[in-house]
From Swiss-Prot:
Keyword entries, A-Z: Activator, Biological rhythms, DNA-binding, Nucleus, Repeat, Transcription, Transcription regulation
Location of the region described as Disordered in the Swiss-Prot/TrEMBL record: 128-152, 171-191
SUPFAM superfamilies: Homeodomain-like (SSF46689)
Pfam family, one: Myb_DNA-binding
Gene3D superfamilies linked: Homeodomain-like
Function: R2R3 MYB-type transcription factor controlling the production of volatile organic compounds (VOCs), including floral volatile benzenoids and phenylpropanoids (FVBP), in flowers of fragrant cultivars (e.g. cv. Mitchell and cv. V26) by regulating the shikimate pathway, via the activation of several genes (e.g. EPSPS, ADT1, PAL1, CFAT and CCoAOMT1). This scent, mostly produced in the evening and night by the petals, attracts the pollinators (e.g. the night-active hawkmoth pollinator Manduca sexta).
Descriptive protein name: MYB-like transcription factor ODO1
Gene name, Swiss-Prot/TrEMBL: ODO1
Domain of life: Eukaryota
GO molecular function per UniProt: transcription cis-regulatory region binding
Length: 294
């Protein structure tokens, strides 16, 4: 809820005060003193609100009120208070007896602010304006100098030198990359060859066939191969050719059953229905030729 209104707005007079209203308000306050401003209009016989009575007394009718412009001492005090309090005019007016906050604010905006600007002082921060101007000009001057230097460098350095420098850097980069790649590939190949040599050496030591194939001097064909034998194996003496032949049976004894079937022809096995006349004639001629030579 907001503040309650000081009076009923019905029947309240607005606008400038008359001389009769000023006399009634002055006589009431001088005889009764300052009291609740909401009750003053009814007690003094005025058709005004309490706020209007208070402002009229404070700003225009009180006896200690000073008229006219502020003195030099008052202006210095206002500047000092404004640097510490800012635009809190009511607090500044409390330090200046006989002066109202509205009067001090009007005097500040019309007179004191212009004096401070002429003196080169900022009326808001109360600091010299030259320092701020110098600080604001420094980055602009530095940027302008950098732009000018960069423009001069671009004009002095020709375009061909930039191209050649870029080409030189690119060729150096390519050479370095190719050298590093070749070095890495050679290292990898050397590592793989060393590993393969170790593997082949181990295999050749364990396997006589591989050791024979990997030898620089080829061995004679007639030289016997010596394979590793375990301790449990026994070496048999070589047998003579006559003993091998005597143990073998004759071909006739072994394949005696085959000679009995040599006399059969194709018709005996029932193949006459499987072949045509031409094929049968071929088989007959083959049999006749074999019988002749046999």
């Amino acid at each position: 809820m907001g503040r309650q209104p000081c009076c009923d707005k019905l029947g309240v007079k607005k606008g400038p005060w008359t001389a009769e209203e000023d006399k009634k308000l002055i006589s009431f306050i001088l005889t009764n003193g300052q009291c609740c401003w909401r009750a003053v209009p009814k007690l003094a016989g005025l058709k005004r609100c309490g706020k209007s009575c208070r402002l009229r007394w404070t700003n225009y009718l009180r006896p200690d009120l000073k008229r006219g412009l502020l003195s030099d001492a008052e202006e210095k005090l206002v500047i000092d208070l404004h640097s510490r309090l800012g635009n809190r005019w009511s607090k500044i007016a409390a330090r200046l007896p006989g002066r109202t906050d509205n009067e001090i604010k009007n005097h500040w905006n019309t007179h004191i602010k212009k004096k401070l600007l002429k003196m080169g002082i900022d009326p808001v921060t109360h600091e010299p304006l030259k320092k701020e101007a110098n600080l604001s000009d420094q980055p602009t001057t530095e940027s302008d100098q950098n732009k000018e230097n960069g423009h001069q460098q671009v004009q002095v350095v020709p375009q061909s030198t930039n191209v050649t420098a870029a080409a030189a850097t690119s060729t150096e980069f390519d050479n370095n990359s190719s050298f590093s790649s070749s070095a890495s590939s050679s290292e990898n190949s050397s590592c793989t060859t060393d590993e393969s040599k170790l593997v082949f050496d181990n295999l050749s030591e364990n396997d006589p066939l591989l050791s024979c194939l990997l030898e620089a001097d080829t061995p004679l064909i007639d030289s016997p191969w010596e394979f590793p034998m375990s301790s449990t194996t026994t070496v048999e003496e070589p047998k003579s050719f006559d003993s091998i032949i005597s143990n073998m049976t004759s071909w006739e004894d072994t394949f005696n059953w085959l000679s009995g079937y040599q006399e059969f022809g194709i018709n005996d096995f029932g193949f006459d229905n499987c072949f045509n006349h031409v094929e049968l004639d071929i088989f007959k001629t083959i049999d006749n030729v074999e019988n002749r030579h046999g």
